[in-house]
Amino acid sequence: VVNGLLDRGFEVSILHTGAHESPEIPAQVEHIHTDPFDSEKTSEALGSQTFDLAIVMYGRLRELANLLVGKAGKLVSVGGVPAYSGWGDADALWPPGMRVPTRETARLVINESKDFAVNRKVANIAITEAAVFELHPSASHIRYPWIYGPGQVACTEWSIVRRILDGREQLILP
């Protein structure tokens, strides 16, 4: 991600603990070393800096989104599994599971009634995503696949990516 932004002419800063410096990151990249899981330390480390674009890929997303209000022109967050009804709580629906394909506007677990058997982890992800969009209405949120790439055990996304890369634009769905 860092090198892709550099290739496109961005001036890049990365915020991380500094515990695992990568030789793949060029020297021109500013490193902001702090604990991204501690909002007070992160706020102090950011100071009054502003950014045209902030890509949040780890740390406490809800807190980081709040810290970046007024500091980031555009927020892109990456993380979490789907927070839609039926994901993580398949037996709460009939037929069981999340509908496939699922629209981006489908019901979230946080929109279910109090008696709905919600998976708490999935509910927390949904609460976080809702907070991101409330704080940054033009934000984009990208969810990680299970594992990305041709070596994953359950090739759920890769089979579709491979078709796109091969120029096969049609996909038969049930």
Where are these regions (language model features)?
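Short aromatic-enriched loop/helix-cap "lid" or pocket-rim segments at secondary-structure transitions
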Residues: 25-27, 87-91, 152-155
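Active-site Tyr-X1-5-Lys
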Residues: 105-141, 145, 156
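Residues at the starts of beta-strands that form the adenosine-phosphate
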Residues: 11-13, 73-74, 138
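Conserved beta-strand scaffold positions in the cores of enzyme catalytic domains, especially
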Residues: 31, 75, 139-141
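NAD(P)-dependent short-chain dehydrogenase/reductase
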Residues: 135-174
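N-terminal Rossmann/SDR dinucleotide-binding element
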Residues: 1-56, 67
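NAD(P)-cofactor binding segment of oxidoreductase domains
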Residues: 47-108, 125-131
